[in-house]
Amino acid sequence: MPRALKRALSVLAAAVLLAHLPAGQAAAARPTLTDGFGLTQVTSAASTAPTNTDNNFVITVTSAQVAGQQNIRIILPSDYAGNPTKRYPVLYFLHGSPDDPSASFYGNDVLAGAPGMITVVPDGGNRGWYANWLDQNTPAGAANWENFHIQQVIPFIDANLRTIATKQARAIAGVSMGGFGAFRYAQRHPGLFSQVGSLSGDLELGANQMTLRLAVVASLTNVSGALCGSSSGTIDCDDDSYAPGVDSDALFGSPYPVFNADWRWNEADPVANAEKLRGMGIHIYIGNGDGGNYDIREWWLESASAHMKTKLDSLGIPVHYENYGNGATWGPYCQGGGHEPGCWYQDLIDLMPRLRSSLTPAS
């Protein structure tokens, strides 16, 4: 779907949502957020864009943990302003690569239409991979993405918005690179999240899944196109999105399985850490890309998702697993079951009610 069309659809969806709000809510002012936890708000084109509304807006922040300005999309339930004492569960939704929370993305209106829940889409960089990079001295600058999200964004949101700041009221999910990030954060911080979801996620980085590992390496080194195998599809993959290139060792050290030099990659493999998800609600969505225009990216990711399900099953850990194949029976938006926004949109239509029914309800 062309980017311009996505933006137009996002604007239209926002207008429709506002048109159906009660007058008092439609006129309500956007919450004022206070700097803190290492985050400083700055004015940017994204934070002042005319597409921002009082219930769906972008703020831009700076942090010593990550280089440059970072966008954070905040989506409030329609009754937020009209109920000043009501508190809400939160979904942290992690985008893919290369992408940006300020872009008009596939699930904006689904997330915006979710009653009783706050959704936060934090910047993960074009290829941040939701980790603190091993090498902090690359041309890309500071890249402590995990610190940024876990130690700064989450407490900033809890301090500024009426959240229910407990594990049982907090979910994390993501698409592609963001699916990897969601599982990684859930596994490393099980005390923070009670629900985790992956939409076409990169769920396996072990040595037996070298194709996906090398796709990550391609994004680091700025190989032409970087396979766009992790792409969420809302940014042109030919616009040098992965510049400047950095060394293949920058993220988790050597990615090459020689004399166990790649041990950090194996340690970061979500499949290898499946046991750490015990007790959480787990949701995995994947296609096979075999719906006409064959999408080999989703085929690779299908294998990773299947391995995750097999590992969870072997551990006796329940998982809601949707493999919709070529997408023919998944829903009208998923054409071909590929690595593309229509299928993720359909995934969110299924996922959001599941999260709402599992999280501590707004009250």
Question: What are the language-model segments listed below?
Answer:
Residues M1-A29:
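Secretory targeting and sorting signals
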